[in-house]
Amino acid sequence: MGALTSPRKVVVLGSTGSIGLSTLSLFEESGAPVQILALTAGRNVERLIEQARRWKPSLAVIEDESRLDDLRAGLAGTGVEAAAGADAVRDAAAMGADWVMSAIVGAAGLAPTVAAARTGAVIALANKESLVCAGPALLAIAKAAGGSVIPVDSEHSAIFQVLQSECAHRVSRLILTASGGPFRTWDKAAMARATPEQAIAHPNWSMGAKISVDSATMMNKGLEMIEASYLFATPEDRVDVVIHPQSVIHSLVEYVDGSTLAQLGPPDMRAPIACAFAWPDRLPWPAPRLDLAAYGQLTFESPDVERFPAIGIAREALRLGGGAPAAMNAANEVAVAAFLDRRIGFLDIAGAVAGTLERMNSLGDLSVAESDAVETAMLIDGSARRIAAEVVAQKRQRA
């Protein structure tokens, strides 16, 4: 894509969540040339109505079918078509946009992201679960359709900007930074008593509840390791994690000659969204500027894998390959939901994920045929959720 002149046709999947809000905020502040074709949301019909009235998309979709009448009433007289359900979300993704923001949380984002990739659109990928569950297949689908996948996670956006594709064979390590989350300095006894309210209080980033809990367990970083391995064709043993509490350095690329390149910036998700929207151009907008003197110092430490076992679980899933990452992700979604519902403790989350992965591996349920990788990933997702629910129930009985 060259200079940003003519309007780009845009679909925002998950427009009412944190990333969706940041995307529309960026468009508002930058005056980016966009024509919104569709906005989709899960349950927040009030916010979706507000967005649709502002941006006048052709279509607004609420996944919760029970809210369709509310959506229609809220959009009466606007000319915006209202629809509901998972199929309608997939239809919105496949409308033929130039650029699709994939920001639906969880494995629910996989099918719409694949549908968008089949159209040849540029996929701005914030839904990390799509890559974790079916990364190689998703990337192949996008490439075959003439499209591309540009990561929106700040860590992968950093690597994307720093890593020159023609130099990929000269890379020795990818280094993902992690804030350490709200429990970075807590001991295990304190973590065992952690409440959902404490877990979602991220020190640097404004995120939804599920992603905030993933940051607290460091499963977020485990998922991102898998993403990085797939996105940048890098083996698991060459993807490292370092704790960087200030969240200023977003990731680093170490080359074989010992040189290390990093991308820096204030912790604001609109920056990687702007990169994904304009690449290889740059989008002028009133971005927060980095004042290194104000920070004074940037600090780093190794992750404590004993207190935060999720990183090791993710490495094991990546080593197992096949459907193991999809199973791990599904189990994590079930366990996090149980924690947010106060059915299990914070430290039970990683145990439930590890237990599910072990059971599925012992049953031989993790093999994936390349020809139907996406469909198989969805089946594995369902199986893992059922097993994870059993594991969670057992942990609750023992509590």
Curated annotation (Swiss-Prot):
Keywords: Isoprene biosynthesis, Manganese, Metal-binding, NADP, Oxidoreductase
Catalytic activity: 2-C-methyl-D-erythritol 4-phosphate + NADP(+) = 1-deoxy-D-xylulose 5-phosphate + NADPH + H(+)
EC id: 1.1.1.267
Binding positions for NADPH per the UniProt entry: T16, G17, S18, I19, G42, R43, N44, N127, E129, G208
Cofactor(s), names only, from the UniProt record: Mg(2+); Mn(2+)
Tree of life domain: Bacteria
Binding site for Mn(2+): D153, E155, E224
UniProt GO molecular function: 1-deoxy-D-xylulose-5-phosphate reductoisomerase activity; manganese ion binding; NADPH binding
Main function: Catalyzes the NADPH-dependent rearrangement and reduction of 1-deoxy-D-xylulose-5-phosphate (DXP) to 2-C-methyl-D-erythritol 4-phosphate (MEP).
Protein name per the record: 1-deoxy-D-xylulose 5-phosphate reductoisomerase
Organism from which the protein derives: Caulobacter vibrioides (strain NA1000 / CB15N) (Caulobacter crescentus)
Name of the coding gene: dxr
